[in-house]
Amino acid sequence: MNNSEQLIALKESETAFLKYFNKADYELVDFSVVEKLDWKQLNHEDLQQMGERNFWQHEHQIYAIRNDFTDQLLRYYSMYPTAATKVAYTGLIIRNNEAAVQVGLENYAPSLANVQQSLKLFIQFIQQQLRDNVYFVVLGHYQLLDALLDKSLQTPDILSMIEERNLSGLVTYLSTEHPIVQILKENTQQQLNVLEHYIPNDHPALVELKIWERWLHTQGYKDIHLDITAQPPRSYYTGLFIQCHFAENESRVLTGGYYKGSIEGFGLGLTL
């Protein structure tokens, strides 16, 4: 496929995504890639993000290039509430001076059934339009870390070692028998079963993970991995997250996660 054909295919995929989810009764939204920001309303995390964003000042006003759709929509709907419970979008994101086209969905005040239906529809779109299918799924939950590791041990060094799966370092700091070490020693496909030995069966994170595992099995997905190493990109990501990896295009990943800040939601996004 030459450059012109790739460009046409990309634009067709964007349009097809909007048509597909318009037909499924999602509200289509189109926001400017340039965000107008108010310094007084930016929190510590917003300021930290500026390292990967292009921003400038003009006549006492700050402008920044969009780097995250969920974040932009959350900020906008916090100021201008919407009655929509499910929205679909396409457009550019720019991170660290690299541009990409993203398509995605947001479920507001989400129920489990609505989120799972959104994921099901998203995968069907990928199968039909992008001619690809889910190869394996990664599940995780941002409450697991607190369930497995005492707050006093959640130092930058230890968190970094967990993220890097540095078992030798973790053994030194935590001990061989520590739950995190024991879980990370297992194959990621087995870790969800092993997790049950280290946190109560009624822990909300474990309950939610098992519900999703069972649902994914009913959808025909058996290759499911647990990730206990991921740390939330923003503090409002407090619950379950999912990554669907694909068979044909290994670099393409459908990602999703629950968040609760000024708005509660569950977002799903795919970079084309």
From Swiss-Prot:
Signal peptide: none annotated. Pathway: Amino-acid biosynthesis; L-histidine biosynthesis; L-histidine from 5-phospho-alpha-D-ribose 1-diphosphate: step 1/9. The keyword Chaperone does not apply. The keyword Acyltransferase does not apply. Keywords: Amino-acid biosynthesis, Cytoplasm, Histidine biosynthesis. NCBIfam families: PRK12294.1. Required for the first step of histidine biosynthesis. May allow the feedback regulation of ATP phosphoribosyltransferase activity by histidine. Heteromultimer composed of HisG and HisZ subunits. This is ATP phosphoribosyltransferase regulatory subunit. The lineage of its organism: Bacteria, Bacillati, Bacillota, Bacilli, Bacillales.
